[in-house]
Design a protein with these regions (language model features):
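Non-catalytic cap/lid and distal C-terminal segments of serine-dependent acyl enzymes
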Residues: 1-235
Length: 235
């Protein structure tokens, strides 16, 4: 079973409509699970200024502690506890064979979830992930808005910080496009590379020439990631 966490502004439908995962999953015998990116519905608060990078479509895979978001924005618990339980109760899955990947904000979510649950996920990969949210504008806004000013709480949702604090993985696969407009300000893959080198975590970091941040990029390399996951899930 492969979990896929989507990025800012997305719902589950972005990857289910544009992700090009079906053929590879069918051939590899994988179940593909794609959660939403935030709570939805009447009464769920969004960004006060209706910005795209906070609130609806931008849950950042944390359990909010700040009001008015704490009641609804519990995306960490949703993707690590509530939804896995629901899936296991209703589908023929093997809980001992799970892996996780994601894009952008979802890449951040996938990597942090995997690092904090190393015994649950056999593989983790990401497309253009936000690897150090504590150090970039998207992450500073989201972590501050959901978790408040406690920077120690932020570190639990920051891939680079988790690695610095001792979290480990057997290996990571990360792709990014060198034409991604968010590369230098928001994504900063060089920080992940440095952290993994220092911690001796095997990292395959691939720079894809000419690709941007879009689903053209994701769909091109999705089957490659799924084959990488399948090899580890079936080992």
């Amino acid at each position: 079973m492969v979990w896929y966490l989507s990025g800012l502004t997305c719902t589950h439908a972005n990857v289910t409509e544009k992700g090009e995962f079906r053929s590879a999953c069918a051939a590899l015998g994988l179940i593909f699970v794609a959660p939403d990116t935030s709570p939805r519905g009447e009464g769920v608060p969004g960004d006060p200024a209706n910005a795209y990078d906070f609130g609806l479509g931008a849950g950042f895979y944390v359990d909010a502690t700040q009001q008015p978001f704490a009641r609804n924005y519990r995306m960490w618990s949703y993707v690590t506890e509530e939804l896995p339980k629901l899936v296991a109760e209703n589908f023929p899955v093997d809980p001992g064979r799970q892996s996780i990947l994601g894009h952008s904000m979802g890449g951040h979510g996938a990597l942090t979830v995997a690092l904090r649950h190393p015994d649950r996920y056999r593989a983790a990969s990401a497309f253009a992930p936000i690897v150090a949210p504590s150090q970039v504008p998207w992450g500073i806004k989201a972590l501050g808005g959901y978790l408040g000013d406690n920077k120690q709480a932020w570190r639990k949702h920051d891939t680079v910080a988790l690695i610095e604090d001792g979290a480990r993985a057997s290996g990571l696969l990360v792709d990014y496009g060198d034409a991604d407009p968010f590369l230098t300000e928001q994504l900063r893959p060089e920080l992940l590379q440095a952290a993994c080198e220092k911690a001796k975590i095997p990292l395959t970091l691939r720079r894809q020439p000419g690709y941007d941040h879009s689903y053209y990029f994701i769909s091109t390399f999705m089957s490659d990631h799924l084959r990488w996951h399948a090899a580890r899930l079936k080992a």
